[in-house]
Amino acid sequence: MASDLESSLTSIDWLPQLTLRATIEKLGSASQAGPPGSSRKCSPGSPTDPNATLSKDEAAVHQDGKPRYSYATLITYAINSSPAKKMTLSEIYRWICDNFPYYKNAGIGWKNSIRHNLSLNKCFRKVPRPRDDPGKGSYWTIDTCPDISRKRRHPPDDDLSQDSPEQEASKSPRGGVAGSGEASLPPEGNPQMSLQSPTSIASYSQGTGSVDGGAVAAGASGRESAEGPPPLYNTNHDFKFSYSEINFQDLSWSFRNLYKSMLEKSSSSSQHGFSSLLGDIPPSNNYYMYQQQQPPPPQQQQQQQQPPQPPPQQSQPQQQQAPAQGPSAVGGAPPLHTPSTDGCTPPGGKQAGAEGYGPPPVMAMHPPPLQHGGYHPHQHHPHSHPAQQPPPPQPQAQGQAPINNTGFAFPSDWCSNIDSLKESFKMVNRLNWSSIEQSQFSELMESLRQAEQKNWTLDQHHIANLCDSLNHFLTQTGHVPPQGGTHRPPAPARIADSCALTSGKQESAMSQVNSYGHPQAPHLYPGPSPMYPIPTQDSAGYNRPAHHMVPRPSVPPPGANEEIPDDFDWDLIT
């Protein structure tokens, strides 16, 4: 006896049976085997037998005193005494008073109890009076199979559980589950679960643009109509565990093993379903990622330099974001204000932005910009200098064939755009200098040597000479399309508005911002400049005549002289 008790306490034979399928099958077999109404829980006061009738002997016993029956039993006796098995409220009152004289002089309280039982007890159902039946009031009858989910004016009694298995089974028909595409379980053999629903696929295609929502919805609807509605439970054999896996020697270990096996099967099935859908999604192309890349082979160099053309409506935001993201992404210090390139970028620059020329990866030989001082890129006032067309680049020298026969990688105004200038530096760094005759580009080699020796803090005329030399070099190598005109020699010392930068105190004096948010007229100082150029109002051309180099002073707004002078020693930072 003790061994049987111990085995019953440690037995987990009931564990495999705790599934939704077993519960539904048990409820179905119980409802089919038992009599009508036997599988439900009756409310308090319900008659034990809905077909019970009052005999004459029992009526004679209760002629003098109060009957021992409940109000629900009295209503059942009254309705079953009728040949049509239905009565109106007044007929029920009359039958009770005729068979039990106690209620004739008991007042009206018992009539209220009769009405409450008819309304709240699920054993009684109201039947509308037919049109051909004259009279007043509806009929009441006994409901042998009451609908538990039928709405009542008041909540049911406390003894009837709201979360009973009977109510859960009645609340989970296919109509309630089919309404939501995410909650539906898949049919057998389909590991993708709810990802095949038209609703989820359509919403997912709006975010990625790689799935046709209409085609998937049509295919899903046709498949559902052909295979029928999905079952209420998962019939996948991967989620079934073997009874032999359970170790009865250690009960806690068996529970842990069972949990681990079910968790692994569910995770593997979900990963397989998501990977089958996400496998065809192409990776997104982000043209603004600043990362160090290896030089690609010559066959792929032209393809990488010319990315696919974005939509026209996105070209202008990319052009505006390119100068702002360049310095801030490298040094980590955002500018004081975002420069707008609408008024200073030439038509060729906008065309270059529309063709997808974003900020290229930063060269490894460039030091961080914060090492030269805490400067921030700024832009001149939009009305300080008018935007002009860039000069034509230097043509190809006569009698010399292009060194590189690849297509043109940059437009003719490559130096007017900071992104194209960065890309040109990167391209020069990728070239194989051993295969190029360096005697033709002595000026460029000398400028690069000076830049490396001075850690790229060149003077303004050195920067201008470097731009001219680089333009000539790219034209000879075939990266810049040659145009008509004579070859212009490198210009002398210039005010390089397109390529020169200032650092330290010169930046604070050059780009002071007044109280209205507009930069003042810059004060031009010769001196060292940092490693990379910055787009300004005159970024279109650096070879313009001398009368265009002098900036037109702008009228300072009121309150400009009230600014606090910058007396901080910026040299201490470096």
Swiss-Prot record:
Coiled-coil residue spans: none
Phosphoserine: residues bearing it: 3, 46, 161, 164, 172
Compositionally biased spans, kind Low complexity: 28-39, 207-223, 267-276, 315-335
Record's compositionally biased regions (Basic residues): 375-384
A GO MF label: RNA polymerase II cis-regulatory region sequence-specific DNA binding
DNA-binding span(s): 66-143
Biased composition regions of type Acidic residues, renumbered to the chain: 563-574
Residues that bear N-acetylalanine: 2
Keywords: Acetylation, Activator, Differentiation, DNA-binding, Meiosis, Nucleus, Phosphoprotein, Spermatogenesis, Transcription, Transcription regulation
Extent of Pro residues compositional bias: 358-370
Tissue specificity comment: Widely expressed.
Major subcellular site: nucleus
Top-rank taxon: Eukaryota
Region Disordered, annotated ranges: 26-61, 125-233, 267-408, 537-574
Pfam (any one): Forkhead
Entry's Gene Ontology cellular component terms: chromatin; fibrillar center; nucleoplasm; nucleus
Biased composition (Polar residues): 45-54, 191-206
Protein name: Forkhead box protein J2
